[in-house]
Amino acid sequence: KICYIINMNKPRYLPIGIQTFEKIRVDNAVYVDKTSFVESLVRNGKPYFLIRPRRFGKSLFLSNLRSYFEGRKDLFEGLAISKTETEWKQYPVFYFDFNVGDFTTEENFRASLGLKLDSYEKIYGPRNLNANSLADRFSDLLKSAHEKTGLQAVVLVDEYDKPLLNAIDDQNLVDAFRKILKTFYGVLKGEDAHIQFVFITGVTRFDKVSIFS
């Protein structure tokens, strides 16, 4: 486990444009403490969907959640949650950031998402050769992560709708992306027994994209 030392002697600055909680804390940048909300969310249930405009702080808050569920106690020193959290468990965290990726074609999108799954398969076990679809691979990963760690998985998705918005001028591509995402996100419902927490962000209301049942 890597432990970073927060440099309290370093001049503080406003972290404009920085969306990574770890960098803000390590650099001792100005941070508005929202960790009490993290504790409340974790305690009160799943899943959560945050639909807000861009530049609203969604990515930073998701990064905050990621650090918490990865058990990064060192990054929360002096913050509200450090006074009440005692366990700091290291959950298996699946983090999907759709702010980045190649969404120019269906093939490129599948490949981009597949590479992300590849990285998790290296951590939680080899790919099941019988799992042909992205959804099947994701389903297997949630199960194997639970079995390997003894803890249910945490799934964090940033800008869930970005692929659809990028393809907005090509209806055929939108339909193809919607089909991929609908089956992929459908895994979250089917594998609920292996999931501890889900938090999804985006800018589009779910009833406008038809990918969640």
Where are the regions a protein language model picked out?
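Phosphate-binding site recognition
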Residues: 1-213
